[in-house]
Amino acid sequence: MTKKALFTGSFDPVTNGHLDIIERASYLFDHVYIGLFYNLEKQGYFSIECRKKMLEEAIRQFKNVSVLVAQDRLAVDLAREVGAKYFVRGLRNSQDFDYEANLEFFNKQLADDIETVYLSTSPSLSPISSSRIRELIYFKASVKPFVPKSVVREVEKMSEE
């Protein structure tokens, strides 16, 4: 039986912290789907198309990882559609745990056959968040140490315009 997992997020933009979780999940599961979701609580900085492109470039080396765009639907519905029996969630800190525990409660109510697997972000990457990256971009500070090259290229393109 193939073990499939779904790792969801808005990835606005994808960070090295996200890639850390994706890489480690790729070793644990036969296939990892990255669910690129539109977060109704967040105003998108990069377009969905741009985020998908940056993600696909960043994960190119992982042969068992693919990106799916999913708007206006629940993660449990996407997981069922692709046959994923696991949600992968990254934890940077205790605030992430509180948020994720609440999310897991509702996911279990909707799909009790899907397990949530938590992966702690590597300590050197735990301070990195997409919102901090967007702040650095706004103030024209370098984001190179914190994001994949695909994001750096998009940021450089934006600054040229």
UniProtKB/Swiss-Prot annotation:
Cofactor(s) for this UniProt protein: Mg(2+)
Q: Where does substrate bind?
A: S10, K42, A75, R89
Site (Transition state stabilizer) residue list: H18
A GO BP annotation: coenzyme A biosynthetic process
Highest taxon in the source lineage: Bacteria
Stored InterPro entries? Cyt_trans-like (IPR004821), PPAT (IPR001980), Rossmann-like_a/b/a_fold (IPR014729)
Pathway this chain belongs to:
Cofactor biosynthesis; coenzyme A biosynthesis; CoA from (R)-pantothenate: step 4/5
Key words of the record? ATP-binding, Coenzyme A biosynthesis, Cytoplasm, Magnesium, Nucleotide-binding, Nucleotidyltransferase, Transferase
UniProt family annotation: Belongs to the bacterial CoaD family.
What protein am I looking at?
Phosphopantetheine adenylyltransferase
What organism is this sequence from? Answer: Streptococcus agalactiae serotype III (strain NEM316)
Organism phylogeny? Bacteria, Bacillati, Bacillota, Bacilli, Lactobacillales
What would be the name of the gene that encodes this protein?
Answer: coaD
